[in-house]
């Protein structure tokens, strides 16, 4: 009842003039349409719940950096943000009586969690991880000019991105929380002692 998707970054090729800045792995996995009932769990606090088709189309989509902002990056505006303390999202479809947890395992420090409801940009409720792979900054060409050039890191990190999907026929919030607890206990057995 699990699927593990791996993306070895050292095997990704790209034109150096057009670096791969962000990557989404299976972005619409488990997406549901406007006729389906259910919800998404996002890592807001101890687990926030976003109901499908909730009609809040005037609000921004949910987006949060896993483990918080990367302070190695320049910031030009003050942003009130929350950080995700755990690399998890879940989709529970009550219409089909199916659900899954998606855990960003390897490469989670590059991840941002994004979730949105139907009726804004498309007709789907979805949740996904977006990985920021190559960072860029605007650099001044010289002190005598106000021209800037976008400069990127030299290459992709030498890591493998890994997402684990844990499937279930349970759609109750507490059952999904227990499923995640079971995953953590299995992965980190010494923490339960």
Predicted features by range, described:
Residues 1-193:
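Carbohydrate-recognition beta-sandwich/jelly-roll modules
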